[in-house]
Each structure stands twice: as structure tokens, then as C-alpha cells.
Swiss-Prot record:
UniProt keyword list: AIDS, Capsid protein, Host cell membrane, Host cytoplasm, Host endosome, Host membrane, Host nucleus, Host-virus interaction, Lipoprotein, Membrane, Metal-binding, Methylation, Myristate, Phosphoprotein, Repeat, RNA-binding, Viral budding, Viral budding via the host ESCRT complexes, Viral nucleoprotein, Viral release from host cell, Virion, Zinc, Zinc-finger
Protein family according to the UniProt entry: Belongs to the primate lentivirus group gag polyprotein family.
Name of protein: Gag polyprotein
Region (Interaction with membrane phosphatidylinositol 4,5-bisphosphate): 73-77
UniProt organism field: Human immunodeficiency virus type 1 group N (isolate YBF106) (HIV-1)
SUPFAM superfamilies noted in UniProt: Retroviral matrix proteins, Retrovirus capsid dimerization domain-like, Retrovirus capsid protein, N-terminal core domain, Retrovirus zinc finger-like domains
Stretches for region Dimerization/Multimerization of capsid protein p24: 279-365
Chain positions found as Asymmetric dimethylarginine: 389, 411
Site feature Cleavage, where: 134-135, 365-366, 379-380, 436-437, 452-453
Record InterPro entries: Gag_p24_C (IPR045345), Gag_p6 (IPR014817), Lentvrl_matrix_N (IPR000071), Matrix_HIV/RSV_N (IPR012344), Primate_lentivir_Gag_pol-like (IPR050195), Retrov_capsid_C (IPR008916), Retrov_capsid_N (IPR008919), Retrovr_matrix (IPR010999)
GO terms, biological process: viral budding via host ESCRT complex; viral translational frameshifting
Region described as Interaction with host CALM1: 8-43
Region listing for Interaction with host PPIA/CYPA and NUP153, in residue ranges: 191-229
Amino acid sequence: MGARASVLTGGKLDQWEAIYLRPGGKKKYRLKHLVWASRELERFACNPGLMDTANGCAQLINQLEPALKTGSEGLRSLXNTLAVLYCVHSNIPVHNTQEALDKIKEKQEQHKSEPKKPEAGTAAAADSSISRNYPLVQNAQGQMVHQPLTPRTLNAWVKVIEEKAFNPEIIPMFMALSEGATPSDLNSMLNTVGGHQAAMQMLKEVINEEAAEWDRTHPAPVGPLPPGQMRDPRGSDIAGTTSTLAEQVAWMTSNPPIPVGDIYRRWIVLGLNRIVRMYSPVSILEIKQGPKEPFRDYVDRFYKTLRAEQATQDVKNWMTETLLVQNANPDCKQILKALGPGATLEEMMTACQGVGGPAHKARVLAEAMAQAQTATSVFVQRGNFKGIRKTIKCFNCGKEGHLARNCKAPRRRGCWKCGQEGHQMKDCKNEGXQANFLGKGWSPFKGRPGNFPQTTTRREPTAPPLESYGSQEEKSTQGKEMQENQEKTETSLYPPLTSLRSLFGNDLSSQ
């Protein structure tokens, strides 16, 4: 089957490439969008050959439309592409995707308002009326017959379960594959799942609960039914356990119809949601962007978890607008807040595309260094020094206010530390400054040695002496008497030596 790049040719291709992707945007549709759409249809087990005609595009749109509300962005983009392609095939002039969607919506409303033609058996009436959803198709006689699911559809469903297990993306896949199916077809899809029997048992319990609720809200009529009237389906009939395929088709095609297939499919989706929540226990509140994680990967994880959340579409929209920005890393959060609350997802991803790369890291580092230098200069200018500033002094001339490298005086020879020539101060091996013979430090360039007497002129007090009173005279006389007594005692104990004869015998100096 492959990617169909030859869906449009000639003038239709020119018309296709003239349509804008968004209202007021600059990007237009290209041939690569057709190739992508055909591959996506193959992935959803749909026939890409239907893209060649307007009727085929309408069938694909009708099949994908029920899953658009809970589908991903890729599924919505596929439906938008098919809508534009339908307008090109039908020669409906449109300028962008939104106009194409509006045209299709208007056409569907007009078709619903038209009265049904009584001659349903003719070929013209069959072509003019919208065909029933697959697998209920209309034969040549105008009768609705059942066409079972193809093995290819069942194989696609089994592969999704094997590859994705019960990730959130299996729900829109199930919705796309089971569109218009009868309860018997849905049971065939469930029976093809070989593994995950615990999940299948949970699904059966949910179906039984919904069937019991149906029986409670739709009680059976009392008494026998009139001849020719069909009985109302019970919960087990909707689940396909107590009803035949003919009864299911009759209920779905009666007037008014009873969509037992859609009801049963809704029950299965409820059970799949519970299983997905069990297999994916991560809450949307726990999805946060890592410091080095690209914004694109973070958005993928966010929407994957959001799909498994059991909430209405309004709540999911609020989560997207609030949590997507709140749980981003600081770099992306700063960019997203600058965009404003009305930014689209495309604008967010474009703005945060380079975050985390080498260029962004270099820019952030440069800004941080510039801020640090600015803060340092402001700190110096304001003079926020708590301690006393140390005055700088030149080693060359000895003056204060500048350093030796900025000194304008002639450069002095020798070491600035010890005064000797032959080496510099950085290579000086002397422990201290040059010392004089008294061991005191002495600069050889100015000043004088420490052994010179340092005379300082001190001012003597010029105040008159204190007046003496009687008590002070008594104290002074007592002090003098005590001193004289002490001197007499020392003289009596240690008589003065008048010569050295008592110590050395004959005094040599006296001879």
C-alpha cells in the first residue's frame, strides 16, 4: 500500500498547496502532508486508497469523528488534513483548515435537515444517502446486512495490545477500530487478547456493573409483548451474551434505532480507562520537566499522562493551560510566561526549542557573569565595606596611593624585601627584612638604624605643685623614717666592703 504521494495531480495539487494550515499563518499544505496522512491511516488500519475520492475522504472523516474528542493531537491533525482534502476533491474553495472544517459542518447540517427519500432501493437513492457505518453495510436491494470484522483489523488490535500493553493510546485506537461494530464484533476483539488476563477480568467486572445499572434504569415491561414487536434489550443482550447477531442488527437498524453497539463500546471504554489508570499510576501533577530535558519530550509525557486522566474536557483544558507551564523547568517557565496565557502549543514548542542546548547554556552563563560583574561594581561603588580599608603602598618609591606596577618613578634596583641585588622580591629567600647588629629590622633605603637614640620632645606639665597639708606631711615623714630604718638594718647585716682583703687575702691593688 505504502505512502500515496500521487493522490492529487495537476490543478488540484496547486489548489492543495495554496491552502494555509492556520488562519493568518504563513505555512501551507505540501505533498509531505499527504504522505504523512496515508501512513497514519495505515497505522490505524484504514485504507489509504479512500483518499483518492471525495466519497472516500467523507467515509474516513465519519469513522474518525467519534474519536476526535478524546484523541491525540496527531489524530486531530489527520482529520483536519482529510477535511481539506475532501474540499479539494469536491472543488470547494477554502483558504485555510478552519474554513474547510466549517464547510463540512455546514454540509452535514444541511444533509440532516433534508427529508429522507422513500425509494431506498434504487441505486440513485443509495448513492445520494449517507451509507451506514461499517460493519453494517447496505446491499444492492437496500437492506442492511452485517459484514464481520476483517482479520486485518483484529490483527492490528492485537499488535497494539502487545506493543503498547495498556498505555493511554490504546483507547483512541480501540475507538477507531470498533466504529459501528456490533456487540458480537466487540466480543471478538476482546477474545483475541491472549495475555493480560487480569486486565480482562477487570474489564468483565466493569461490564457486569454497567449491565446491572442498565437493567435497573430500564426495567422490563410487564406482560407479553404484542405480535411483531421486538423486545427491549437487557444488559446481557447489550453485552452480546444473551442476544444473537440478527437481534443486534435489528436493534441497530430499527426505527427508532437502539445503538446497542455504541452502548456496549462505551462500557468497554470505561473499563479500559480503569485499566489504563492502574497500569499508569503516575498522576498528571507528578509530570515535571527535568533540568536538561527537552521541552518536546516533556510535552509528550504530559499529554500521554493527561490522556489517562479521568476528567472532562474542560478540566483537561485547564490542566493543560496551568500545569504545562507550572511544571516546566525554570528556563522554559520564564519563556512561557513571557509568551502570555493565550499562546498556542506550537508557539510554546517553537519558543522553547533551543532550551538546554549549548547555545542556550552559553547565553545563560554570559548573562549570569554579566549580572555578577554588575553586582560587584555596585557593591564597590556604594562602599559597603564593613572593615577598615587597607591603604596600598608602593614598594618602589615608598609612597601611598598606588602600586609599584603603576609607579611613575624610576624603577629601583634590587630586592624590595631585603635590599640586595641579583634577585626579585618574589624569589627572595630571606625570612624577614634586613636586620642591623642589634637584631632589629631596618630598611636600607630610608630611615636610620634602631641603635640610634630616639629622642622625642615631651611637654612637661606647667601646673603648680600640689599644696601640702598636715596629713600629707605626716605621711611623708613616716615614709622617710621607715626608709632610714631599712637602710640601717641592711648596713648592720651587710657591712660595706672597704677593701678586697677579706675576700682574696692580700689585696694586690694595695701592694
